[in-house]
């Protein structure tokens, strides 16, 4: 019947999501767990894979694991515009270049070249974007020629 078709369609729409992954990153990410976490998080439009690794630039999440801002600890630059960083008020994580999104996010993406993080920061006040933390996340940036030789060794660990 028509109501059953609508119900099934809405169920598919709620579960539909897309894995976006920087092509020059190798990782030990548990993609199945990441996708499951995203799909079972109501009202979340994007899930960013993050880790507690040391960096100078951190994504900042509130107690509900929702994206609030960004800080460069070397310069104390913050984003988005008007965001005020206060030490100890946020969970600070390094971004991995890996995320899961809903179709809503894909429809909001601007055309042209831009930073995906700047895009997320520009919409985080009106769209729920959460973090998925992998404490033992290992990453290798194979976009750097000197790291290409390390790729085979990196992959052999898994």
Regions found by a protein language model. Give the residues of each.
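Short phosphate-binding loop-to-helix
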Residues: 1-20, 79-82
